[in-house]
Amino acid sequence: MHWLLNLDVGVFRFINGTLSNSVFDVIMPFASGNPFFFPALAVAGMLLLWKGGKRGWLCAVMLALILWPGDSFICNTIKHAVARPRPFVALTDVRQPAAKHPSGPAPRMEHPQGNPAAPASEPNHNSMPSSHAANWFAATMICYVFFRRSWKFMLPLACLVSFSRLYNGMHYPSDVLAGAILGAGYGAAGLWAFESLWRVAGRKWFPLWWEKFPSLVNFPPQPAGDPDFEDEAPPPLEETRHASLDAHWLRLGYIFIAVCLCANLVYLLSGLIGLSDDEAYQWIWSKHLALSYYSKPLLIAYTQWLGTHLWGDTVFGVRFFSPVIGAILGFLLLRFFAREVNARAGFFLVLIVSATPLLALGSVLMTIDPLSVLFWTAAMISGWRAIQPGAKTGPWLWTGLWLGLGFLSKYTELLQLVCWVVFFILWKPARVHLRKPGPYLALVINLLCTAPVLIWNRQHGWITVIHVASNASANRPWEPSWSHLADFASFLGVESFLLNPIFFIAAIWAGIAFWRRARHDPRLVYLFCMGSPLFLIYLLFTLHSRVLPNWIAPAVLPMFCVMVIYWDTRWRLGVRSLKSWLVAGLAIGFLVVGFMHESSLVQHIVGRPLPPKIDPLTRVRAYPALARTVEEAREKLEAEGKPAFIIAGHYGTTGQLSFYIPEARATVADHPLVYFQTTTNAINQFYFWPGYVGNRTGQNAIYVKELGTPPLVKGWITSWLEGKPMESLARPVPAAKAPPAFLLQEFDSVKDLGLYNIYYRGRIFHTIQMFECRNLH
């Protein structure tokens, strides 16, 4: 084996050193990763879907289903098991033309202030096998199966990228060879597995489609002029055949929902992201169950309580019900559309929802929004059944219950009552129900559900009302200004991104156009009234106060329902350009959703990570490292002989430290180790729980203040594209601040420990300042 290792290193030295030249120094870093790869990939993907026909669609689906699991679970698992250091780590004099720093062992991260920092996650220095080679050869194999001539450009590209990994000093030849064999192998194996599954499941569950396509990789010749079920509106079919086709789409929808549920659960189990501030804060609520809380109703705490009792105080336990809620929503929408529109439209609605960033993130983050959207949608669907001619009282009772549970999730649910008023005004036939007891019983149930919140607020000085009024700037008179117009435009811009630009425009267009073409359709009028009023209320409110993008979340699904019904009707009337827009929307949406789930993909594509300031995952990363840094300081202080606890300057930091410090997590319910700083008035839930004053007298403490992520300098994009060091893209870390006055009053002495940079994969994600506080009065 020794001679093989020598041969491996010798070939590497020859390629990395002997073959080096100024031309390759430009070409090879570009081949490994460049800023044009992502746009080129997006264009290639859209062309494949647009011009590739059935083969193109299946090829794209197989690439998505095989490459990501292969890279994440096969390559990464082997890398961590083998743990072979990369050449630039293990060897000296390794050339790295793609890097701006000298080669050799990875330099230790230094901190501007010279203070020690929390242990940081080092960049991935495992070498065997090469993921670049595996991904490219897997893609080459898959493309070759669907398009035989694709090897003429895919194979040279795969070889070029693989060679560049050697030239750039990132891999040994054996790494690249193993990656190429592994990638081609799992690419072929994945295709074989899906082909075998289709031959069995397709024949049983999708017989009409299986008759047309008995194989996923071998297509029978298509007679000229024979329409496909995706490319043409289906011709009139006999009732039984139409029902069978609808059942096919319904089953496909069920499978897609199940796959998304499993994928989201696996994503949570992977540990790629940690808790956000709100999740950690509300996790503490779940340890103190009550009728309500300072700023939110009670259901979020009870949901997290149930999740953590099922799976423990883990990130998975806290977030478990978010993917479950997403699956329930998909099921409700699919069944609703299958009954009221058609199953094909229902499937595409579920697909569109999954390609919408705001809604996709709601399937992995456990905040109040998933609960709010769930009960808003459930009330909308049961309400539709309630207003049907001849409907009994039962659907109204369910509607009242869903409205009430929605209120116990988020106070925005009160605006759904406004939506009902708008509907009764716009749709005269529905007013007959106002002469029946159903709507009033629903209202009574809704009001009964408000009792816990009202009781708790009466006991706590109506603090929630004060808080909500303060957030809405209710006491501030409206004054027109350019800043309000800027907020208005900013709100539209942010929402257009979070709702997918193509789907956002399509939804707005449908919400306006249906009044001219289909205003006599009760489905469209009802769904319009269940979503658009909420969106318009918040849009207009931006002219008075700042509105957060997630506030309109309950309105999105009703607006998308209107969009799908309207454009499905237009498709059946012969508007064929819709297919291209749908493909573009899905392609853009899934790419954005993928990057928002794992922003490190940017580094794999362009060769460098995003600056933390614009990384969408900054708020859910590096907190375990931050907690270790704080805990080390506390343990050092406690070693002096007195017990020591922790004080945090922000509710989110309090929650994060309570969750990620093991001792704090174990005692958070009865004897907290981490406290929020003392305040004279209620600004969060911690005000209503016992604090450290009076309970920790005579003890020492570590005070932690998070200073945030360093802002970016002007022109950072150019510097980032040029590959300049990440430190040069951000402004200097904020200067240390004086200790807060209340600390000086509460303790005998306060010592500034300085600033600490918290690193994640070599980048500064957070900066904190800590103080040693001795002898609490």
Name each model-derived stretch.
Residues 69, 137, 320-345, 378, ...:
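Transmembrane-helix motifs of polytopic, lipid-linked glycan transferases
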Residues 569-606:
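Signature aromatic-anchored transmembrane alpha helix within multi-pass, membrane-resident enzymes
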Residues 140-149, 338-344, 379-396:
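Membrane-interface transmembrane helices that cradle and orient dolichyl/undecaprenyl
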Residues 358-372:
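Short acidic/glycine- and proline-prone juxtamembrane loop motifs at membrane-interface regions
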Residues 263-264, 271, 405, 416-545:
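Transmembrane-lumen/periplasm boundary regions of multi-pass, lipid-linked membrane glycan transferases
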Residues 346-354, 403, 407:
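Short helix- or helix-capping micro-motifs
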